[in-house]
From Swiss-Prot:
The chain crosses the membrane at residues 236-256. Expressed in plasmocytoid dendritic cells. Expressed in suprabasal skin keratinocytes and squamous cells (at protein level). Expressed in the brain and weakly in spleen and skin. Expressed in plasmocytoid dendritic cells. It is found in: Cell membrane; Cytoplasmic vesicle, Secretory vesicle, Synaptic vesicle membrane; Endoplasmic reticulum-Golgi intermediate compartment membrane; Endosome membrane. Glycans are attached at residues 35, 53, 127. GO terms for cellular component: cytoplasmic vesicle membrane; dendrite membrane; early endosome membrane; endoplasmic reticulum-Golgi intermediate compartment membrane; endosome membrane; GABA-ergic synapse; growth cone membrane; late endosome membrane. Gene3D superfamilies: 2.40.160.110. It comes from Homo sapiens. This is Lysosome-associated membrane glycoprotein 5.
């Protein structure tokens, strides 16, 4: 009985040691995160890099702005009116992140943590007619804001921290092994904990890859958003049509020139038979 009694605590101690070892391994493998926004030529765009074991595992370039509605008292101090705060993600933000095989995460904090953005990416495999196909997507966005912060909010009623979350989000869907690129603006609606308020997140100049980065600090092949592809087609279509029209004109002129030359070299046969004697 004594041996059995001693064996149970030993097993518990072993479990505790294993849990501590697992925790220490996670801490030692914790990724380093860099804010490289100063390298961007676009003052509104931020650049974030997450690295694990000296290798880039997540890269994100984008400009982000949040449209946040909030209530203030009307001049009669009886009615409420809704104002709007435009909050841009600024340079010099604090960044955290982690990479995983099927889940990656990016967190950004700015203005003394009055604002926080959390983006969760997932990689999934789907069974298609031609076989399994893997994609990644932005599956969740969370925005925490403090309406008592005076730079963007003016005399907000019930000022304090609020959390806005996406609902059943599936954005930036991209084939696995590729990066997502989109210069056009994209909007994502977030339901706020502030009653009956919806926060709008506006993304632009986006270039993101949260999985399968092969070269350090280098994006993989781009998967462009449909809006960019359509705009690119609209830009190149007039050029293509112009080239086709120019080619048609050149071919027409060449045919005319050849026809004219062949016609000029032909012997003109007189219609009047009396003129045959003058030939030869």
């Amino acid at each position: 009985m004594d041996l059995q009694g001693r064996g149970v605590p030993s097993i518990d101690r072993l479990r505790v040691l294993l849990m501590l070892f697992h925790t220490m391994a996670q801490i030692m493998a914790e990724q380093e995160v860099e804010n490289l926004s100063g390298l961007s030529t676009n003052p509104e765009k931020d650049i974030f890099v997450v690295r694990e074991n000296g290798t880039t595992c997540l890269m994100a370039e984008f400009a982000a702005k949040f449209i946040v509605p909030y209530d203030v008292w009307a001049s009669n101090y009886v009615d409420l009116i809704t104002e709007q705060a435009d909050i841009a993600l600024t340079r010099g933000a604090e960044v955290k992140g982690r990479c995983g095989h099927s889940q990656s995460e990016l967190q950004v904090f700015w203005v003394d943590r009055a604002y926080a953005l959390k983006m969760l990416f997932v990689k999934e495999s789907h069974n298609m007619s031609k076989g399994p196909e893997a994609t990644w997507r932005l599956s969740k966005v969370q925005f925490v804001y403090d309406s008592s912060e005076k730079t963007h909010f003016k005399d907000a009623v019930s000022a304090g921290k609020h959390t806005a979350n996406s609902h059943h989000l599936s954005a930036l869907v991209t084939p696995a092994g590729k990066s997502y690129e989109c210069q056009a603006q994209q909007t994502i609606s977030l339901a706020s904990s502030d009653p009956q308020k919806t926060v709008t997140m506006i993304l632009s100049a986006v270039h993101i890859q949260p999985f399968d980065i092969i070269s350090d600090f280098v994006f993989s092949e781009e998967h462009k958003c449909p809006v960019d592809e359509r705009e690119q087609l609209e830009e190149t279509l007039p050029l293509i049509l112009g080239l086709i029209l120019g080619l048609v004109i050149m071919v027409t002129l060449a045919i005319y020139h050849v026809h004219h030359k062949m016609t000029a070299n032909q012997v003109q046969i007189p219609r009047d038979r009396s003129q045959y004697k003058h030939m030869g």
